[in-house]
Amino acid sequence: MAKITFIGAGSTVFAKNLLGDILSFPDLANSEIALFDIDAERLRTSEVVANRVAEALDAHPTITATTDRRQALEGADYSICMIQVAGYKPGTVVDFEIPKKYGLRQTIADTLGIGGIMRGLRTIPV
C-alpha cells in the first residue's frame, strides 16, 4: 500500500479534486493518505472532505491529518507539494490586482500570465 503525503492540504478544493483523482485508480484506492498543513482549522476541514470523497468513491484509504510535517512525510512513497507561498491574501489577490491595474486580464489558472509568473517567482525557491 502506497503512502501519499499532501503538503499544504489546507487547500481544501485542490486537495479534494486531487484526492478524487488518486482514489479513482483501483491500485491507489486503499492507499495511506497523510494530510499536512500548518493551519489546523483548514486541515480539519480537508480531513472531513477527504473522508467524504473516499466514501463517495467507495475507496478505503487510511486518512491521517497532522500539523507535524515530519510525521506526515515519514515513510511516504509520494509527496505532493500544494503550498501557496503568501497565501490567498496577499498572494493570489496581488496576482490578479497588478495585471488588472495595467489593463491585463489574468486568468484563473495559477501558472499563466503575469500573475502566474509572480506566483512562480514566489514558489520556485521553496
Model regions: which residues?
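N-terminal Rossmann-like dinucleotide-binding module
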Residues: 2-29
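Residues at the starts of beta-strands that form the adenosine-phosphate
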Residues: 3, 32, 62
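Phosphate/oxyanion-binding active-site loops and adjacent basic polyanion-contact surfaces
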Residues: 11-15, 42-46, 119-126
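Short, solvent-exposed loop/turn and secondary-structure capping segments
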Residues: 16-17, 46, 90-93
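NAD(P)-binding Rossmann-fold cofactor-contacting core
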Residues: 27-53
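Short acidic low-complexity segments
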Residues: 62-75
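N-terminal Rossmann-like NAD(P) cofactor-binding module of classical short-chain dehydrogenase/reductase
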Residues: 73, 77-83
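Rossmann-fold NAD(P)-binding glycine/threonine-rich loop
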Residues: 85-126
